[in-house]
Amino acid sequence: MKLIKFTIGLCLGILLIALPFSQFQTSPLNPLETLVVQQGGRKKPLDTVAQETVAKIHGSTVYKHNDIKEDAMTTFMSLWLNNRNWNEEPFVLFSYRPLKERIGLDPDQKYFSFQELMTNSALGEVVREAHRKELEEQDLSRNEREALTLEGRLTLMLGSVDDNTIAIVPHPSDTKGKWMGISEEQTLYSDSATAPLMASFAVMKQMFLSGPDHLPMLVPVAADLKAGLSALSPNVYPAEGAMDQEVFFNHFHPFAKAWMLYGLAFVVMLFTLWVKPLDLYWSAIGLFIGGVAVQSYGFWLRMQIAGRPPVTNMYESVIWVGFGIAAIALTFELIYKAKYYLLAAAPLAVMCLILADSLPAVLDPSISPLVPVLRDNFWLSIHVPTIALSYASFALALGIGHVSLGSYLFTPEAKSRLQLLSQLNYRVLQVGVLLLTAGIILGGIWAHFSWGRFWGWDPKETWALIALLCYLVPLHGRLVGWIGNFGISVASVAAFNAVLMAWYGVNFVLGTGLHSYGFGTGGSEWMIASVVGVDMLFVLAATVRHKGWLTKLFHAASEQQPGKVVS
């Protein structure tokens, strides 16, 4: 019976994976998706260029034009071939409210036109001041960092409407040489060699400019264009089918499908707990394993495309932590069969993957060449994943801590469950401390080879150490009897704030230190602070309930006798 239920869950997961995901499955621009472009230090398909460009400028791969949703390829081709007035389109994402207020823009408006931003003199002053500080190696304010991010979006948009910036013409002989735009190919090749290619490009451009009715005839033209580019330099141009894997990865959306499976497993596990006769535990396990398998496949595809471990920026660390939460929870769940590991892990893994999928302007999903300090694949492959897995362990402990505190708050009489949750939490905290300790030591060794010192009190290093100490204190306190089961639950929730600071705060709030390759902008400090504040109120409520402070207060008030008035 267990095997049958497990198989049912796994089959449901496979069915979900097999369903078409994208709403843009039959675009007439599909033949152009595998057109090879040299950009950002590597060769990538035009489909990837389109998705990255639109996501970076607009904050989403879907753009709504005249109440019609356009996919990234349609929007990018319109930009590239400039078939409408993009100067006036409210296309550029600008969401940082304080900077909008400072430069006189509507703080409630999210998207602005290229023209509106380029002609804003106050914005220009902030950008110039930011560049001056960069030259003098001074720290930038949040406004200045956001202004530079916005400048990058405007620069990218300006470059996207220029034929020469989309490098599709290969170098004649050097596999690492610089490619050219279609209008610059005469600098590399003779007119006779490029004439057929220019003709194919002109036909393609005319088809697109003539309207959507002509796009279905694009297939042979796209084939001629790709064949012509390959014929120019067959030893340099990637082989036929070289871009297929990356295009498949873009459209398969493995991480989105993984969070759907995690979410479904969570719902099934809830039914198992709430509806006792309906024992679907192994079906939930099957769905959860399906999610882990799909996410693992997504990591493998990304590694094949990038040629390195997928843990080099904030986007990759978020999806890796989500994977770590799921994998660690699954391991413990298969050992203890307690249900609570999966119940705590699934929402956290879903949250990580949804955040990574829905915030491309903040968590950049593009695959880029590594900065020099990260090019040692050995240290990159062991230090960063180890640190991220420790964060995953602590996040899982955070989830179990919430389940435990919820029990203290609403069902304090369930003593056996509270004891079990404390034991489960303690095991995860031990794993997290072990991994974080190992990660800090490995990072110190890597720093010694890269920067010539083992420890330099860099903000990232300092906050990692603070996080470790925040977890070591309650673990040792439990050993010597200073804190009990409730204290472990509180510590697993409260101490995660140190992890949040080491992981998010150093990158998006402080933005200083030698770990600059992990920095970013666009994170909402107030939103994070609000979530943390509400979470601490939850901890306080559970503490008040557990300690019985309100009961004692009411009891003391009821025992007081009314005083007598003396004349």
Where does each model-flagged region fall?
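Membrane-interface interhelical loops and short amphipathic "cap" helices
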Residues: 25-37, 42, 229-252, 297-318, ...
